[in-house]
Each structure stands twice: as structure tokens, then as C-alpha cells.
A protein has these predicted regions:
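Post-transcriptional modification and biogenesis factors for structured RNAs
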Residues: 1-151
Length: 151
């Protein structure tokens, strides 16, 4: 399946929602430190309900060690600064999807390290800043999974 990477997530309910999504879709979740919360935060647990035990979750000290542990998969960054629509990408098993922290998105040095075709944007109405992190992850995962025939 896919790897979902949350880079320094800040809001526990968003991460809890993503844990539940990963449990239901078979994606592996990777959290890049520092986290903006403790893993035993009640809001994180509540959002994830009882799905925590069904999700594959790993914490990493930095993005480089995460990617190394995964064997350097093909990486797509989801960002409001991307110019390529996410639905134009062809996803494959084992791809990794990277999402930035809620308050600021991915740092420029992370985005600049990726080719433009791997910096993807979800469509939004003009004048809107961004979508909720867990909603963005859900849209991305389900589009990629749809492309694989939900297998």
C-alpha cells in the first residue's frame, strides 16, 4: 500500500483522523518529529477511536531517516505551493505522500528538494488558503487507492 508521512503535525485530532484512515485503507503512517502533542493525548485517541491498534505507525526523528527506512520510495508532497493537480499524477504501490504541519505547510527546503511534478496541489476555490490536513490526506489516499482499483 502507500506510506502517509505527516511532517511535524501539530493538532492531535487531525493525526487521530489520519490514524483511523490508515487503519481502514491499509496505509502505513509515519510521523516526523517534533510532534505538537503527546501520543497519549486524549484528543488524538478520541479522533482515532479504537483504530490505533489496527494502524501501522512509526515515529521518526527527521524526514531523511524516515525515507531511508522506507528504501527511498517515490515521494509526493501535497502543498498549496504545488502547481501540478494531484489527479494528474499516476500513483503506484509503495509511493509515499508527504504532508506539512497545519500552521505553515512544508518548509521550502523540503519542497525544493522535489521535482515540480512531485509537488501536488488539491483544487480549491480562489482566495482560500488551505484544506484541513486530515481531509487532504483522505482525498489523496482515496484517489491513489482508486487508481489501484481499491486493492
Amino acid at each position: 500500500m502507500f506510506h502517509v508521512i505527516l511532517f511535524q503535525p501539530e493538532i492531535p485530532p487531525n493525526t487521530g483522523n489520519v490514524i483511523r484512515l490508515c487503519a481502514n485503507s491499509g496505509c502505513h503512517l509515519h510521523l516526523i518529529e517534533p510532534l505538537g502533542f503527546e501520543m497519549d493525548d486524549k484528543r488524538l485517541r478520541r479522533a482515532g477511536l479504537d483504530y490505533h491498534e489496527y494502524a501501522t505507525l512509526q515515529r521518526h526523528t527527521d524526514l531523511a531517516s524516515c525515507l531511508e527506512s522506507l528504501g527511498h520510495p517515490r515521494l509526493f508532497a501535497f502543498t498549496t505551493k504545488g502547481s501540478r493537480p494531484f489527479h494528474d499524477a499516476s500513483f503506484a504501490e509503495g509511493d509515499a505522500f508527504l504532508f506539512g504541519p497545519e500552521s505553515r505547510g512544508l518548509p521550502a527546503e523540503v519542497l525544493d528538494a522535489l521535482p515540480a511534478e512531485q509537488r501536488l496541489r488539491l483544487p480549491m476555490r480562489e482566495g482560500c488558503r488551505s484544506l484541513n490536513l486530515s481531509n487532504t490526506v483522505a482525498v489523496a489516499v482515496y484517489e491513489a487507492w482508486r487508481q489501484l482499483g481499491f486493492k
